[in-house]
């Protein structure tokens, strides 16, 4: 007769898995932050341009660019901040959209389009140009205009809607990008109530309860488990491990430069 595990043993196994996958990485990130000289206040942070993008007048094609940067102060232990930059062909100025937690959530051109975020170098996730970008821009602009959480007081740092919830909402309207925000973009999984359906990239399936708990399985997302907005999982497309706080550890991700479909 095969012995069965006792309920106490099973509970201990689950608790150990939660500790190993969710709590330990956050404690490690907190320790690294405590030992760092990262700015603790926005007043001390560098918000200057990094020079990643040319002047809009020197870039003729339409472009859609998505950036992330480690969030400021203690929030950087848990999350990155995401924003989107776009321009129509021959337009003389970039348009940068962010969502923030004070005043009106949606902000236009409050910072340099390729600026550091709280002193942290931005990471470019996608850079679509030419006719493909021109095709996406009207839907992106419509999503910005119709965003459900655009009024003062709508912002919630956790579990959302926050800056990452905003960019995730945009990605859902342009699934041909085949893009997902990093696993440490806390708030990206926020959806009001219960959701079961396609992932943000359109390449998989997810179940989600208000961004607080969920499971994803997809080509772009890999395998992800969401617990209280923290994500652990595996990336099989570009092999890597996903851990709360650290995001993704593994093979470097290429910048998305063409539509997936």
Predicted regions span which residues?
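Activation targets extended, charge/polar-rich intrinsically disordered C-terminal tails
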Residues: 2-46, 148-261
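Glycine-rich catalytic cores of cysteine/serine-nucleophile enzymes that process amide/ester linkages
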Residues: 35-131, 153-157, 231, 236-249
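Ubiquitin-like/PB1-type beta-grasp interaction modules and other compact soluble beta-rich domains
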Residues: 94, 108, 144, 178, ...
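Mid-length scaffold segments of soluble, non-membrane domains
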Residues: 111-176
């Amino acid at each position: 007769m095969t012995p069965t595990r006792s309920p106490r043993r099973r509970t201990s196994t689950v608790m150990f898995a939660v500790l190993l996958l969710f709590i330990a990485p956050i404690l490690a990130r907190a320790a690294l932050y405590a030992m760092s000289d990262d700015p603790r206040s926005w007043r001390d942070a560098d918000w200057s341009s990094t020079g990643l993008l040319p002047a809009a007048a020197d870039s003729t094609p339409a472009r859609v660019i998505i950036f992330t940067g480690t969030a400021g102060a203690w929030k950087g232990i848990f999350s990155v901040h995401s924003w989107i930059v776009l321009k129509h062909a021959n337009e003389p100025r970039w348009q940068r959209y962010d969502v923030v937690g004070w005043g009106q959530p949606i902000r236009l051109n409050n910072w340099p389009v390729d600026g550091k975020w709280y002193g942290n170098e931005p990471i470019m996730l996608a850079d679509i140009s030419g006719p493909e970008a021109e095709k996406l821009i009207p839907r992106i602009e419509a999503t910005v205009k119709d965003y459900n959480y655009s009024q003062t007081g709508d912002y919630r740092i956790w579990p959302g809607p926050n800056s990452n919830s905003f960019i995730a909402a945009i990605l859902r309207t342009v699934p041909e990008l085949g893009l997902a925000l990093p696993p440490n973009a806390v708030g990206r999984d926020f959806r009001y109530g219960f959701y079961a359906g396609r992932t943000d990239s359109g390449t998989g399936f997810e179940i989600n309860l208000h961004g607080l708990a969920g499971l994803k399985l997809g080509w772009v997302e890999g395998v992800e488990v969401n617990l209280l907005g923290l994500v652990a999982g595996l990336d099989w497309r570009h092999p890597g491990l996903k851990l709360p706080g650290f995001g993704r550890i593994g093979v470097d991700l290429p910048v998305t430069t063409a539509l997936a479909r």
